[in-house]
Amino acid sequence: MTSATPLPVLPDYAELHCISNFTFLTGASHPSELVERAKLYGYQALALTDECSVAGTARALVASKEHELKLIIGSRFTVRNADGEPWLRLVLLAQNIEGYGNLSEIITHARLAAPKGEYRLLADDLASPQGELAHLRGAPDCLAILLPDYDPDPQQLLAQAWWCQRVFGDRLSIALELPLRHADDRHRGTVLAVSEQIDVPMVATGGVQMHTRQRKPLHDVLTAIRLSKPLSECGLELAPSAEQAMRTRMQLAFLYQGEGGEKILRRTVELAALCNFSLDEIEYEYPSEVVPEGMTPAEYLRAETFAGAARRYPNGVSEKVHAQIEEELGLIAELGYEPFFLTVYDVVKFARNEGILCQGRGSAANSAVCYCLGITEVNPDSGNTLFARFLSRARNEPPDIDVDFEHQRREEVIQYIYKKYGVTRTALAAALITYRTRSALRDVGRALGIDLGIVEQVAKGQAWWDSRKEFAQRAGQQGLDPESPLVLRWAQLVDQLRGFPRHLSQHVGGFVIAQGKLSRLVPIENAAMENRRVIQWDKDDLESLRLLKVDVLALGMLTAIRRTLDMVDALPGRREHYGATAKLAMQNLPDDDTETYDMICRAETIGVFQIESRAQQSMLPRLRPREYYDLVIQVAIVRPGPIQGGMVHPYLQRREAKRNGNTDCVTYPGPEVKAVLERTLGVPIFQEQVMEIAMKAGDFTADDADRLRRDMAAWKRKGNLTQHQERLVHAMVVKRRYDPAFVEALCKQMEGFAEYGFPESHAAGFAKLAYVSSFLKCHEPAAFFAALLNSQPMGFYSPSQLVQEARRSHVRVLPADVTASVWDSTLHPRADGETGEDGLVQPDIRLGLNRIRGMRKPAAERIEAARAQAPFTSVEDLAHRAALDRHDLNVLAAANALKSLAGHRRQALWQTLALQEPGHDHALLRQARPVEAPLELPAPPIGEEVMADYGSLGLSLQSHPVELLRARLERMRFATAATLAGYRNGQLARACGIVTVRQRPGTANGTIFVSIEDETGAINVILWPHLIERQRREVLNAQLLGVYGKWQCERETRHLVAQHLVDLTPLLGRLATSSRDFH
């Protein structure tokens, strides 16, 4: 009887070569999964070494703190020779903060030397960098690990090792990775021989690419996606086994048995002990040039704040505001944030000096300092602000100041930042693009070799809210067996891939600006957009590392408002009408206009800011805003937070009761609560109100209240509200004898704020823009809609819908025409001089040439310049004097923009085709050309005209597509939107229209809201879940939708509750329409 082989002693181990899914389409595990598994296996440390990247390190850091595992920051590189050919692979590990800065600069240099998504690191970049990079020679303060190829050529490995030893000296080790393949013994012998020959120690590494072997199928799919091949064609490019998964220490002990194995494993822990850098050591330094010489940041911020206060309050600063300013300045100084406020102030000051509309949003609107600096527009003297919502001692993260700028002029602001601070000190934050259901379905389906047509149909039929059960049904509808191994494998891999990083994009506007070289704090790489650079961390990473960003955001409505005001200002008599002594501005508009609020209460808000969506339009006739603060509530109440917290219906009921004279409809359990909730009729609509109650009635400090805010936001993920709720119960019920039912309801409402909700200050800022845009639509509709058209792309509605709404607002819209149009849509005096009820003449809108698909701006500018010299006499004259080529003439003819020179579309196209190559013919030949009788072509039928309009302009002024089908629809007994408006509540009805909007709010329990449009207006349709499941294809895909259902109307709220749907899209023929789906 033989004795069993004794088990080896479990070795101490640190994994020093590990990539995550931030090595895009290669790593098959999240950083947090790798950290958790390393801790489970008893590793001493884990080095995250993604390919020329530290993008995943911030998330790994959070996980390492949670699991109490040492995290080492590193990166893997392929080093190329002088010819640019791959030569060797190595890992660099940061030993300290200097080493991390050097590593970050090396990554930056390699990334900026290549297009987005790639990198290029030459041997000379490490061995003998020149100029500003000379200090990176040999990657000081970084450990280097040479990664030999599997079963390498001994001479080639020797050459690689000699070079690495010369560059990195005694900081070099040679990795021994054993993937349990056919040549492991020979591989081990070769690496050992080279190690001994040049006296460089070996170290065990795993080349980890997944935390568990069960991820091997996903790893294969990622490889196939990366190679753009189906799995069946990948062959040897797939990993031969799952040995790139993390190994237990028992597995490692067996694997590295034999000569030197124990030493090789021990070396991992020795190297880990030499790496003592944490991302927490990164110290961000603010830019200093925003502070004038001779002043400290605190002195300058105080001076500018009180100078701004004097401008904001010409009659004197109230004691309340003065005290708030002093409190804020004290806390800002304590936390050292003055340079950040001054940096944002500098950017805003530039924008205002250049006439660029801007406005701060979010919790920054709680700050009196921000208001006085002109960053935000919410007056702390008249609004309800809570500074703790914006900044507190307890918050272990920087303040968040988001500023919206006109979206068409934001580039000027961005270039100002680059020019002021330089490209080495500033870059945009990254936006991490991850796999969602449809993208995962498509990529996995292709990798599995499923027919592309089937893949596309299944992906199109799969909505974001669908479960795996619905996926199986969609696959079955395409002829696949839902229970087949292929479909089950497809579903499983999609589940795994969903949420995986795909690539880094650029954040919508978050700039990180540093005092010194930004690339020593975080690597920088090229963005897809020219002259853009992004760092490798996204906004969440920046918050976890306490790095500040300046958010330079784009808001289309600011562009539209500025353009509207400019056009109105140019109209005769308008300045006098609005009492403006200089150029018309928002401040000149009355802030309590009755007609504007009447229009809002009728939900005629297409095109205006924030209150134009289907959900907002449904709420407006119920809430019926009559003043500014009503709009603040309106903007905020249609959000998941208030809805899930059960706050909407109680508020509306109390508002209605109060409107009907019932002044006793609201009671308060105590004066502290009344002081906070009186403005919202006893219902906490805003998160700040819960914080205020906690402070005034629950004995919370400002820092305690901020912790409550954070825990409310994280309740769904962490469920950590109990301690706060218990504290409130004790303070309010036990101590102050409040009604327990009220406190219990408050605690439930706190859970509702785990869903998204607007801060009151944010809603207040947006309400201002909602009112201004509503006023302009009500009183200056021509300028407003022309500005919206010129500000595209933006907003909730398409240009076609905006033009329809302009016409419903009694604005005449004239077609694009080369004899009258310029690039933008413009205002033209009405020939009849008709005035509105306010005595103002409303001009017509002339569509601009920018509405024509394929039209190029330089050609439009040449047309305008030539027309200014003399009117065009013919298409030939136009082509010659404006130097238009065949493309220009064809798109103009297709858009019917040559009608005044050539007649209808067919005639115009014929004339353009009859010309020689425009812009290049000679005058002598033109004079000698024979005169021929023009060929008269028949005009196209109206249906063809409308289709051509939509194809070229995306809209038609001649007829609505549904109007062309009206005779047929009447035979099918479909009523128009105008007819439905007269139906009684509960009447059976049927309607047909083009689908313009589909929405499925997360708070609507699966209900979908659809808007359809016919020639007389829009119809709001409600689809209940049972109908959605029964008629899914019609719900998701129909462009022209017939609806059978029951009409519901209450005051101004009208909608059609669907009972049956019909997809009538084929009736549209080749007409292409578009809808805004599930945004």
Curated annotation (Swiss-Prot):
Entry keyword DNA damage: yes
GO CC field: cytoplasm
Source organism superkingdom: Bacteria
First-tier enzyme category under EC: transferase
Catalysed reaction equations from the record: DNA(n) + a 2'-deoxyribonucleoside 5'-triphosphate = DNA(n+1) + diphosphate
InterPro entries: DNA_pol3_alpha_NTPase_dom (IPR011708), DNA_pol3_finger (IPR040982), DnaE2 (IPR023073), DnaE2/DnaE/PolC (IPR004805), DNAPol_HHH (IPR029460), NA-bd_OB_tRNA (IPR004365), PHP_dom (IPR004013), Pol/His_phosphatase_N (IPR003141)
UniProt GO MF annotations: 3'-5' exonuclease activity; DNA-directed DNA polymerase activity; nucleic acid binding
BP term (GO), one: DNA replication
Protein location: Cytoplasm
Predominant localisation class: cytoplasm
Keyword Membrane: no
SMART domains: POLIIIAc (SM00481)
Coiled-coil ranges per UniProt: none
EC numbers on record: 2.7.7.7
Key words, A-Z: Cytoplasm, DNA damage, DNA repair, DNA replication, DNA-directed DNA polymerase, Nucleotidyltransferase, Transferase
Similarity field: Belongs to the DNA polymerase type-C family. DnaE2 subfamily.
PANTHER family reported for this sequence: DNA POLYMERASE III SUBUNIT ALPHA, ERROR-PRONE DNA POLYMERASE
Function as written in the Swiss-Prot or TrEMBL entry: DNA polymerase involved in damage-induced mutagenesis and translesion synthesis (TLS). It is not the major replicative DNA polymerase.
Protein name: Error-prone DNA polymerase
Organism: Ralstonia pickettii (strain 12J)
Phylogenetic lineage: Bacteria, Pseudomonadati, Pseudomonadota, Betaproteobacteria, Burkholderiales
The gene coding this protein: dnaE2
